[in-house]
């Protein structure tokens, strides 16, 4: 599908850490819970592994599959919203994590895209990713999250 028919959100941040530490923060369930508003991740972290985000009550926010994985540099997830019927109806999206060392930091680029124009899912994630990634950055650099209440939830 050409770019005109695709919706995309890209977020770039620099985090003072190492690629292995950032990778662990992105994939270790108890660490994820700290910055992702008490939601955690479950996955085997291999190509083809099922992937899911789980609330404390056991309900799913998102599910998917690992499409590509190259620790600690790159990961691509087929991502399906599960909690909002309107967003779920758009079908699966694709989320790419890229980690690049830069001096004493890591450049983290998140690209979340779907093959449909004017996606409500991409509008929603464009509001959610900044708060989660701000928390991730704060937690790795200071030991504390910046935001304790998920905006919009």
Residue ranges, per PLM feature:
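Short beta-edge strand/loop motif at the mouth of beta-sheet-based domains
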Residues: 10-11, 30-63, 149-153
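Short acidic N-proximal helix/loop "leader" segments that mark the beginning
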Residues: 1-10
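Hydrophobic pocket/interface hotspot
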Residues: 22-23, 32, 51, 66, ...
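Hydrophobic/aromatic beta-strand elements that line small-molecule binding cavities or substrate pockets
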Residues: 13, 63-68, 93-100
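Amphipathic alpha-helical segments
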Residues: 16-34
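A short, structured loop/turn motif at beta-sheet edges
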Residues: 19-20, 67-74, 98-107
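Short, highly charged C-terminal tails/helix-capping segments
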Residues: 138-153
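Beta-strand/loop substructures that line and gate deep hydrophobic ligand-binding cavities in soluble
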Residues: 84-130, 147
């Amino acid at each position: 599908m050409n770019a005109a028919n695709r919706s995309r959100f890209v977020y770039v941040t620099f985090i003072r850490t190492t690629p292995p530490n950032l990778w662990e923060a992105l994939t270790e369930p108890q660490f994820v819970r700290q910055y992702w508003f008490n939601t955690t991740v479950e996955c085997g972290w291999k190509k083809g592994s099922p992937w899911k985000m789980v609330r404390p009550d056991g309900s799913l926010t998102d599910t998917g599959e690992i499409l590509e994985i190259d620790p600690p540099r790159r990961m691509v997830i087929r991502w399906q919203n599960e909690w909002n019927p309107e967003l779920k109806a758009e079908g699966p999206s694709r989320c790419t994590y890229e980690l690049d060392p830069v001096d004493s930091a890591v450049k983290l680029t998140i690209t979340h895209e779907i093959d449909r124009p004017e996606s409500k899912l991409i509008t929603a994630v464009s509001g959610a990713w900044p708060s989660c990634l701000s928390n991730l950055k704060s937690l790795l650099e200071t030991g504390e999250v910046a935001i304790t209440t998920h905006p919009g939830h």
